[in-house]
Amino acid sequence: MKSLGVYLKHYKKESIIAPLFKLLEVVFDLLVPMVVAQIIDVGIAGNNRPYIVSRFGILVLMASVGLCCSFTAQYFAAKASVGCATELRQAVFDHIQALSFTELDTIGTDTLITRLINDINQVQNGINMGLRLLLRSPFIVFGSVVMAFTVNVKCAIVFLVTIPILFVAVFGIMLVSIPLFKKVQAALDRVTGMTRENLNGVRVIRAFCREEQSVADFEKSNDELTRLNEFVGKISALLNPLTYVLINIAAVVLIWQAGLQVNIGSMQQGQVVALYNYMLQIIVELIKLASLIITLNKSVACAERVSGVLAVPTTMNYPAKGGAAKKVTGDAAVTFKNVSFTYAGAGAESLSDISFTAKRGQTIGIIGGTGSGKSTLVSLISRFYDATSGDVMVDGENVKNYTKEELCNKVGVVQQKAVLFKGSIRDNMKWGKEDATDAEIWEALTTAQAKEVVEGKQDQLDFMLEQNGKNLSGGQKQRLSIARALVKKPEILILDDSSSALDFATDAKLRKAVHNLEENTTTFLVSQRIAGIRQADQILVLGNGTLEGNGTHDELMKTCEVYREIYFSQFPEERAAYNNESGVIA
């Protein structure tokens, strides 16, 4: 929580001016009943029209000044709250960008979206209301009691008795309801997460005819949220009727006591009206204060959740100064030395004691069953994750010695799921290289077999993509994603099963084009299909996180049982020939 105060400190002036102008408004609010009392006791009682008009003018003037004070307070409170929320949102977003995939996996996407949007909006609302009302309500209550004593001491005692009872009623309800609001927020998070998951996976849900189950699951979570909201609502609903009953009882006592004072001549009718108005001001402000405290408690809870995200330390630390990229030694592009890796919270290792060397310019194929660790292995090269033990070397230097920019410039990654951003094709291609020329973009598109795709669009490079490239097919998105990585001409290119949506002919052309890249480009091909990696200079065979085999296709057919089984599962007609020849299948 203290860490969030830093952002409000940037708006010290606004945070001081807003409450001050609210206090000025309160002063005029407290004077209004006294002026009304004078109009009744002097103007109306004495049939003094000029006096009534003059006091009416004073009321209009006070209302105008109070309105100006209110507008000023609102302006500065809004400026402080919006500015603080904007800086806080930016800080959280910047911090998220600095987190490694390990922290992102632990926190979860749904949680981060909720913190960035809902929680920070709640913090903004709390700051706004706090600056405007946190001092106003107590000051009105205290000021009304003081003003009541200036009118009549005996009647003011009714205020002293009523206010503590009102406080107990109002804040008693709050003490019960505030903890429940945290449960409501947690239930809302679950509903939000389920909504996002269902919307993202709506095609899968319909493909498996799981609509009814999804509706049932959502209904269960939604009913839980509704139940909590209704329970809290019932408790909170007691606030207004209970306080109004108390205030009406107090008003009856006040009027009775004031009537006695009027009968003996120690009070005038206008003063009775003033006391009643002060009583009404107190109840209104107590209800406002109760609502404010509920809002502030929600804001504090949300602020703690946001602060929790900011407090998550990143395990991915980069050196402040570069230079590792210049220290190229030997012909080894990528080296794994006894590398093991375990995902946060996982019981078993995803990779265990992996060692191999990929020379500069080689094509490395990676194959294995589902969950064997293929994507995890290549993620360590680009340092999406850090190895639990062992060393990952790029050009003879540990990846931890590279700055983020150096490693990003050296390694190009195309992941399994093709992600394109809203904007033109040219804009998306320049993610790989900001100053890329059209010629460089077309060269990359040609290599990625995407030239025909772009040429077929009316605006070609200026063709506007929808969010996540929804106006393209799966294969088109994959080819554009590959082209985006190729634009910057990376020294290490990682294709993580990124051609799964391509037809066989296009995939073959792509493999050939990638194989003909510049001599110093080292390519990692992750694939489920042996045809996609058969011609690789080196093939890594993974099984349950261990390196089961390493070599060329011919070598692995002789030495690696796992590789042979994968091969024969995809080419069953070759098994008989292999058994007959007991040799290598060309």
Label every model-predicted segment:
Residues 47-57, 147-161, 175, 231-304, ...:
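Helix-loop-helix
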Residues 1-29, 36, 44-59, 65, ...:
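Membrane-integrated ABC transporters
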Residues 314-329:
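Pre-NBD coupling/linker segments of ABC/ABC-like ATPases
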Residues 10-13, 98-102, 118-131, 135, ...:
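An intracellular "coupling" helix at the cytosolic face of ABC transporter transmembrane type-1 domains
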Residues 327-586:
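ABC-type nucleotide-binding domain
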Residues 10, 14-27, 38, 58, ...:
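Transmembrane helices of ABC transporter permease
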